Amino acid sequence: MKLRAVARMSRTYAAFSLVLLAATVGAASAAESPFVGTWQLNVEKSKLAGETFSYTATPTGFQYSNGSTVKFDFATDGKDYPVIAGRTVSWTQNGNNTWDSVYKDGHGTVLSKVHRVLSADGKTMTVISTDYHADGTTSQETDIRERVSGGPGLAGTWKEVKVKVTSHTLIISMPSAGHVKYENPRQKQILEGPLDGTPSRVQGPIAPEGTVAFKQPGSNKLTWTFASKGTVLQQGEDTVSSDGKTLTSVSWFPGKESEKTIEVFDKQ
């Protein structure tokens, strides 16, 4: 699963890109769990577009909102502004139709750089994001957004109609019965905790400030909730296919269940 509440902000949203995958074992042994192993994101089978969000002009700049529990103010003056989960963003405008932003963690480490270009007719925005990972590598994402309403310029409601990402690897293990450990190698992030709904803090050098709580409704399924500072930012459900070869992670923002993102992973 991808913590889109943390991630979408930098492409709106790419800089908080934290991919977490949960697993469930219950009373079964780790060897019997269908979640244990190495998983690779199948970009072609995944559905990553469809989300809507807005930029609203304010007396001092703009306010971003995902229409759910994520909202923050910023200006295009190059200064750092707080967003969520301990992240900051700085924006600059270059001409009438081009914007650049830089997302950082609480220690000032650059997480993502985002370049946005608005079409001449003001109807389409192309967004290119470069994400900087903890292992020293980078990856690029390209999004196409269409204006739903509003304008001119950045202001208005937008919908993502195309999202192009690079694949990544997830490693899942079961250290003990009723516990899951997930590792994201390129982010050097670990999520380890119980499957009884108890919140577990995300660990890692550039991890966001937040917790994920898991529950197990079935042997091949779990539900999860990501929260930061007491506010639920994202929810989801992960399911392993009956043949054990595919993991499907469906996620959404609270109150926006009609805009679900679907990530499909192949077992390696």
Give the positions of each predicted feature:
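Hydrophobic small-molecule pocket/channel-lining residues, especially in calycin-type beta-barrels
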Residues: 31-268
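Hydrophobic helical h-region of N-terminal Sec-dependent signal peptides
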Residues: 15-21, 25
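Bacterial N-terminal signal peptides that target proteins for export
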Residues: 2-17
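Sec/Tat signal peptide C-region and signal peptidase I cleavage site
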Residues: 25-31
